[in-house]
Amino acid sequence: EICACLVGSEMCIRDRLYYPLCVLYFFIAFPLYARFAGGKGAAKKLFQHILKPAVTSLGTCSSIATIPANMEAAEEIGIPRDVSDIVLPLGATMHMDGSVFSAILKISFLFGFFGMPFDGIGTYVTALMIAIFSGIAMSGVAGGGFVGEMVIVSLFFPEQMGIAFPVIATIGALVDPPATCINASGDTVASMIVARFVEGKGWFQKKQAERAEKAGA
């Protein structure tokens, strides 16, 4: 495989943890966030309607292209329109937790590729800060990962730019789709959390009760 050929089996094993991490974050962290945001039943409601935004983001690699699907999901979940109208467009350009995951992977991969030790608190803190900064530098459009990759290479490996950028761009093509999925799907979860603080703790139950009353009328 690519990573085994370039940097050896140890680095390859570590990099393979990225995909399980994305899956665990999607199926464990998102329900916990939804539970916090809406209480009982919120996580179930989230997963009834999050599939379309997730698939759209995987197919387009664009958080902005996923906004219509996210708006539809937010409406079905019961998120107030005044919340989703603000949070979802902002989240498409600012909410980049998946991109931070992928940036850490890209940085550690390049360290292994160039034979540099990726260890020590200083290295970890620097990598995390650059990962966050590169996530902010990205836009929500398809291919926005190239901007973040350029930031990583220019800050960490400026003298090896000609070699490092093609390598990190290749890795990015493999890891950016799940990162975008977490970014975009997480925008709906973020809207639920904002709704809790704007509408109050029981907003989700009130919305479901209103819908049940209308359905029974």
Task: Label each region the model flagged.
Residues 28, 46-50, 54-66, 93, ...:
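Hydrophobic, small-residue-rich transmembrane alpha-helices and their short perimembrane loops
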Residues 10, 17, 48, 122-126:
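Alpha-helical transmembrane segments of integral membrane proteins
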Residues 21, 25-29, 98, 102, ...:
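Alpha-helical transmembrane segments of multipass membrane proteins
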Residues 1-13:
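Single conserved hydrophobic/aromatic residue that forms the stacking wall/gate
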Residues 52-135, 204, 208-209:
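Helix-loop-helix junctions within the multi-pass membrane cores of secondary transporters/permeases
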Residues 4, 34-36, 69-79, 93, ...:
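Helix-loop junctions at the membrane interface of multi-pass solute transporters
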Residues 7, 104-217:
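Transmembrane alpha-helical segments and their short flanking loops
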Residues 14-76:
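Acidic, glycine-rich loop-and-beta core segments that form the ion-binding/anion-interacting portion
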